[in-house]
């Protein structure tokens, strides 16, 4: 960690000319005179690529961006990502592509790690709620994780509960491998409002449907309402977020596959981003 910070400091102070970094670390580099970026692998979306490439040329002088992209079997990629299949179908397709060992198979591996499935997530959320116990009092609960996978699953469940207004805040301590969670007393109307606000900001066209489902949950046994609310948010995440990220990944793959000329890529990016802005406004009006 100390070495990483030192390398970044030397790069930003022009005492080093090259920096190799992960996407997350590289996005934190604010330096106006970067002349060249080299992207290994597929960006998660065209928007992400636009932001990552934007690390270079901030002083308005010429900067060059290159992407190294590998795809063994375009037909397999299209079969996996071009349709609107469910997550089980995608998992089977990704399994067949593992031996390709290309950027597409690696991108699918990370995507599927981020989305384990609705049944798995609902079960994990149920386990977390059991550990939290009584939701009628304000309290602080400590969770411990063993490895990166268990941390990811646990943190994902806690974030879902936070979006439901059940968890007030959470803090991760990596050195002790603990997550400290502040719980607010459960209030259905507060959770309802929290979810409505989240949907209104992210997917306003779906708000009416979500509100109808919230009305149904309100009629259920109060002790089961937190789980029902979390299940609702998990279903929404997979129906909207997972499918959206899958589609964005495919669009990034098509960009890498079909365009190599500077002007073509630049025009494609501009058209794509402008279309996205227009689509967002239409969705808000729907």
Task: Show the residue positions of the predicted features.
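C-terminal helicase lobe
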Residues: 1-25, 29-286
């Amino acid at each position: 960690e100390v070495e990483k910070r030192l390398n970044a400091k030397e790069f930003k102070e022009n005492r080093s000319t090259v920096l190799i970094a992960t996407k997350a670390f590289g996005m934190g580099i604010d330096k106006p005179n970067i002349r060249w970026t080299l992207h290994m692998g597929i960006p998660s979306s065209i928007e992400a690529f636009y932001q990552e490439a934007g690390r270079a040329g901030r002083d308005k002088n010429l900067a060059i961006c290159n992407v190294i992209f590998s795809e063994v079997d375009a037909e397999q990629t299209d079969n996996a990502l071009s349709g609107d299949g469910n997550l089980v179908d995608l998992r089977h397709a990704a399994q067949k592509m593992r031996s390709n060992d290309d950027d597409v198979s690696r991108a699918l591996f990370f995507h599927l790690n981020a989305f384990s499935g609705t049944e798995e997530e609902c079960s994990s959320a149920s386990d977390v709620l059991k550990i939290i116990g009584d939701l009628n009092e304000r309290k602080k609960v400590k969770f411990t994780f063993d490895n990166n996978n268990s941390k990811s699953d646990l943190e994902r469940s806690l974030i879902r509960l936070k979006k439901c207004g059940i968890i007030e805040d959470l803090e991760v301590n990596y050195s002790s491998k603990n997550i400290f969670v502040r719980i607010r007393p459960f209030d259905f109307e507060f959770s309802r409002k929290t979810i409505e606000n989240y949907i209104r900001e992210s997917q306003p066209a779906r708000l009416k449907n979500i509100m109808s489902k919230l009305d149904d949950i309100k009629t259920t046994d109060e002790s089961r309402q937190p789980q029902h609310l979390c299940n609702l948010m998990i279903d929404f995440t997979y129906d909207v977020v997972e499918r959206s990220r899958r589609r964005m990944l495919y669009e990034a793959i098509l960009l890498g596959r079909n365009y190599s000329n500077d002007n073509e890529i630049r025009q494609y990016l501009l058209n794509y981003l402008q279309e996205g802005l227009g689509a967002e406004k239409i969705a808000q009006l729907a």
